[in-house]
C-alpha cells in the first residue's frame, strides 16, 4: 500500500473526478488520521446535510482522527469544491459522484459512514450503487437524519414559514454562541455557508438545486425498499436524534410569532417532535443490530454542540466491526 490518500496523516486537495460528463468534476477532499495498515481496516466518511460543507464537521474530525482515519468532502458547487458540472443535484447523481471520487483516489471499502440530515438520503443512494452493501459499509451513524417520508410528514405551515423568512438561523437558534468551534472555524462556516467564495455565482445555485430536489430524491429512495429489506443487517448502525424543535422554538421566538399564537405554536412543536422521533426511529430498520441515541443538548446540528457524543458513538461502532 503506497497510496498517499491511505497513508498520509493529513492530506487535502481538489480532486479531478471523471463523472462521464463534458468535463471532470472538481471535488475537495480531506483526510486526517492514522495510516491504513491493511486493506480490511475500516475508514470513516462524513456526508454533510443539504447545502452544507465539511466546515461543520471540523471538530468531529479532529476528535476522531487520533485513532480513526476520517475522510470529509464538499459536494459539487459547495464549499471548497469546484462548480457543479451536472444538474439537477439529485441524491442519486451526488451518490454517483461520491462513488467516483473514492474510486479516483483509490480508497476502497470497508467504510463507516457518518451522515447528517439529508446526507442520509445521499448515503443510502450510495448503498444502492454497491453490489455488496453490507460488506462495503460495515457501520453507519445517522445524525438527525432524513428518511423516505421526512419531507412528506414534517411540514411547517405556510404562515409559520413566512414568519421565519429573512432570519439568520445561526444567530436565532443560538448556534452562533452555543458550539465547540474555534473563532476561525466559525468564520469559515459563515463564509462558506453564505456562498461568499471564489466561485460566488455558482455556489448558491448548487445549494438551491439540492434543496429543490430533496423531496423527489426521497421518493426515489422509497422505491428501493431498503428499510423493509434491512439491507445493512447485521452491521451496527446508530440513529442519533437531536431536537430540531428546539431550533424552531428559538426561531419562532425571535420572529415574534410566539407572542401572536403561543398555543398554536406549542401544539405544532409537540406534533412535529413526535413525528420527527418516529421517522428517525424507523431508520433503525436498516439493520437488526441498531440502537437509538437521543442527544440531550442539541438542536439539529449535533456536530456543533455535542461533537463528543458523535465521537463516542463512532468509536463504539468501530470496536464492533474491527
UniProtKB/Swiss-Prot annotation:
Coiled-coil blocks: none
Keyword rRNA-binding tagged: no
InterPro entries to which the protein is assigned, alphabetical: AB_hydrolase_1, AB_hydrolase_fold
Residues annotated as domain AB hydrolase-1: 36-319
Pfam families membership: Abhydrolase_6
Record keywords: Hydrolase
Protein family according to the UniProt entry: Belongs to the AB hydrolase superfamily.
Name of the protein: AB hydrolase superfamily protein FGSG_00044
Organism of origin: Gibberella zeae (strain ATCC MYA-4620 / CBS 123657 / FGSC 9075 / NRRL 31084 / PH-1) (Wheat head blight fungus)
Amino acid at each position: 500500500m503506497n497510496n498517499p490518500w491511505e497513508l498520509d496523516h493529513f492530506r487535502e486537495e481538489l480532486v479531478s473526478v471523471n463523472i462521464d460528463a463534458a468535463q471532470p468534476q472538481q471535488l475537495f477532499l480531506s483526510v486526517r488520521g492514522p495510516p491504513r495498515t491493511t486493506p480490511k481496516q475500516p475508514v470513516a466518511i462524513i456526508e454533510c446535510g443539504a447545502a452544507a460543507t465539511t466546515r461543520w464537521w471540523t471538530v468531529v474530525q479532529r476528535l476522531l482522527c487520533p485513532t480513526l482515519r476520517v475522510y470529509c468532502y464538499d459536494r459539487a458547487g459547495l464549499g471548497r469544491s469546484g462548480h457543479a458540472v451536472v444538474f439537477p443535484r439529485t441524491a442519486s447523481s451526488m451518490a454517483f459522484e461520491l462513488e467516483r471520487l473514492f474510486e479516483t483516489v483509490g480508497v476502497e471499502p470497508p467504510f463507516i459512514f457518518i451522515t447528517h440530515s439529508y446526507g442520509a438520503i445521499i448515503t443510502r443512494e450510495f448503498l444502492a450503487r454497491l453490489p455488496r452493501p453490507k460488506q462495503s459499509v460495515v457501520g453507519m451513524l445517522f445524525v438527525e437524519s432524513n428518511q423516505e417520508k421526512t419531507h412528506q410528514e414534517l411540514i411547517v405551515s405556510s404562515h409559520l414559514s413566512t414568519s421565519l423568512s429573512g432570519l439568520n438561523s445561526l444567530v436565532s437558534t443560538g448556534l452562533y454562541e452555543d458550539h465547540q468551534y474555534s473563532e476561525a472555524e466559525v468564520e469559515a462556516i459563515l463564509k462558506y455557508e453564505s456562498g461568499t467564495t471564489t466561485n460566488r455565482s455558482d455556489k448558491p445555485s448548487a445549494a438551491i438545486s439540492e434543496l429543490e430536489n430533496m423531496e423527489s430524491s426521497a421518493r426515489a429512495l422509497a422505491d428501493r425498499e431498503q428499510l423493509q429489506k434491512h439491507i445493512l443487517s447485521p452491521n451496527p448502525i446508530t440513529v442519533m436524534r437531536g431536537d430540531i424543535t428546539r431550533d424552531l422554538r428559538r426561531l419562532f421566538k425571535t420572529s415574534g410569532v410566539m407572542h401572536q399564537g403561543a398555543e398554536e405554536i406549542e401544539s405544532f412543536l409537540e406534533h412535529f417532535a413526535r413525528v420527527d422521533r418516529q421517522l428517525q426511529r424507523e431508520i433503525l430498520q436498516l439493520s437488526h443490530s441498531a440502537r437509538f441515541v437521543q442527544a440531550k443538548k442539541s438542536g439539529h446540528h449535533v456536530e456543533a454542540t455535542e461533537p463528543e457524543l458523535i465521537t463516542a458513538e463512532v468509536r463504539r461502532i468501530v470496536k464492533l466491526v474491527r
